[in-house]
Amino acid sequence: MSGDTCVQTWPCSYYLELEKRWVPGRLSLTSLSLKFMTDKTRETLVSFPLSSIIEIKKEASHFIFSSITILERDHSKHWFSSLQPSRNAVFSVIEHFWRELLLSESGAAAEAASSSMTKGKELTCLMACTQKRLEDTARVLHHQGEQLDGISRGLDKMESDLDVADRLLTELESPSWWPFSSKLWKTPSETKPKWDASMADSKAFGKEGIVIQVPAVISQRTESHVKPGRLTVLVSGLEIYNSDSLLMHRFEREDVDDIKVHTPYEISICQRFIGKPDISYRLISAKMPEVIPILEVQFSKKIELLEVAMMLGSTRTSSLAEKGYSVWHAASGLMDQATHCEPSSGSQEGRPLQLQTSEPVISEEDTQELGQILRKLKGLALDTETELERQDEALDGITEAVDRATLTIDKHNRRMKKLT
């Protein structure tokens, strides 16, 4: 499960209060917990959920240098020192996941209530996640369609300009005594402002369309220098901001050379250059599993899943598929029971005992909510299919227009060479 996926592991030392000594080992962080394992015996000395933490601090004293302290609800205090690559880097990552867990809906309250979640609620949550994923994909397709429309308008204007060039070349090729040379061409002045305005509107609306924003821990050159910030995924590219909402760097969509997915929570973005250093950022975020599917749609040819990420992704996908199938199977059976099984007067004596021992049926409220989500999914799927078909037709038209423009430009070049 994603909650058991290791986000980061750091070499460090843990202070044993009873024995008054430091123990070397490794501190491991998952999206839901933190644990320390010794180097010699591989024994787990401490392990606790992030939801039990009430305070994370950077402390130091005359005998404990450059440490991170973690205080739990039961007032247990843990000291970690000799942190690599640096104390600030480890502190920033742990604090980020701790804050995101407290702020998220699936934090401590949702975790406590998950044990009593009914099959109907599980199915509703699964369908809601599917709906959100489809909405994100539809939003990307919508902005992509607007960009294709802008390209089509640009090609139309190019054809209009080539027609003007054709008439101008015809005038230059005609004899000086030809009386109709000045009437061969006119510039459609009313077309250009109209196109420029529509293109500007389309560019302002589609190019800067925000798909998703997530908080992240950002490092650029070395892992020891990290800072909190934000990753913004746009239709036109990616933007990285610091904690003061100041833009650190903007990657245009065509400037991104590769995106590597190291874990479900960590990616690196690189823009390569010849003759000067590459621009590369490494980002860790608790919300990264929501971003990666969108990046796979936008940068399908540039994104690379590394071996660990592929293994974890396939495991998570298979487990989710199995869980989804089991929930669907159970829920469909329960919905059939709730819909088709009407209690008869002769069987009411044994019915209460059967209901007490069986799984709880889907409530009427869950059934109505599922129906609404399914109707929205159907509408989104149909709209997405229509948009894809429209974009296929637009791409065919763009291809034909580019071919025509290429032939026309070649013909004009030959005519201009004859004139010179």
Curated annotation (Swiss-Prot):
InterPro entries: PH-like_dom_sf, T_SNARE_dom
GO cellular component: endomembrane system; perinuclear region of cytoplasm; plasma membrane; presynapse; SNARE complex
Source taxon at top rank: Eukaryota
CDD domains in the cross-refs: SNARE_SNAP47C, SNARE_SNAP47N
Biased composition (Polar residues): 342-357
Spans annotated as Disordered: 338-357
GO molecular function: SNAP receptor activity; syntaxin binding
Keywords, alphabetical: Coiled coil, Cytoplasm, Membrane, Repeat
BP-aspect Gene Ontology terms: exocytosis; synaptic vesicle fusion to presynaptic active zone membrane; synaptic vesicle priming
Domain t-SNARE coiled-coil homology: from-to ranges: 110-172, 357-419
Subcellular localization, as worded in the UniProt entry: Endomembrane system; Cytoplasm, Perinuclear region
Family stated for the protein in its record: Belongs to the SVAP1 family.
Binding partners and assembly: Forms a complex containing SNAP47, VAMP2 and STX1A. Associates with the BLOC-1 complex. Interacts with BLOC1S6.
Purpose: May play a role in intracellular membrane fusion.
Protein name: Synaptosomal-associated protein 47
